[in-house]
Amino acid sequence: KMTMITKTSPQFVVCLRNNGYEASLEPRKIYQTLSDKEAESHKMLRVIDESGEDYLFPASLFSPISLPQTLVKELALSA
């Protein structure tokens, strides 16, 4: 079953800690997320990591952040 990714403006989170994911995540770094309602129901986030691929990580490792629209356009990996 394919997960539908809804086309919304890019969302970003800041990594608070990388416990258990030291190779994939850097604390205090901003990451883009992809909407995934099924993952969110399991307290997970679909995050685009250092490799440019999206993976599921525990939502507790991140905090959502609001960015100015101009910065969102600059940081968005896919538009």
Regions found by a protein language model. Name each.
Residues 1-3:
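Short, Lys/Arg-enriched N-terminal segments with co-localized hydrophobic residues
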Residues 56-79:
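C-terminal structural segments of small proteins and small subunits
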Residues 7-13:
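Short structural boundary motif marking the start of a folded domain
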